[in-house]
Amino acid sequence: MATKGIVKGIVSNLVTVEVDGPVSQNEICYISVGGVKLMAEVIKVIGKNAFVQVFESTRGMRVGDEAEFEGHMLEVTLGPGMLSRNYDGLQNDLDKMEGVFLRRGEYTFPLDNDKLWDFKPLAKVGDKVAAGGWLGEVDENFQPHKIMVPFTFKGEYTVKSLKEAGQYTIGEVIAVLTDETGKDVE
């Protein structure tokens, strides 16, 4: 269950939130302000108080507004297409923006879900792989972009299936790996 909290103090974009459970430094939370969720990052925790930095204007925020903590740190999405896009500090795709600014509480997905990429397998069925191991590659701006085993994967995996060379979107499953306990993961 996600940790929740209530805004207890606001000084510009620094907000104090009283929490009902565990939170960690650098964890992401969203504070609801008039139906809009504003992203923030925990910068300090003292007892039941989390001190968070909101990434946009806190105009309209009030003591008593609700916050929900995500249980994970600020992350970026890695994948083909990153080298040909323009991002802000939260990896919002600036080319998708209408006008000069994103609307408050609005975030964009950083990669193109519809683009087809020419995939070339580098591993083969039966290979043993681990976090960071190369499964294949796609070319982006004449540079090979490696498709890797996610860095969050622990231990050794066996490649159960792997797509053949061809065109695929970033949302398609490229490989199925089997972990040391026999569990399959995509």
Model-flagged regions — what are they?
Residues A2, K8-V11:
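Extreme N-terminal "head/tail" segments of very large remodeling/mechanoenzyme assemblies
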Residues A2-T3, E18-E186:
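Acidic-enriched and Gly/Ser
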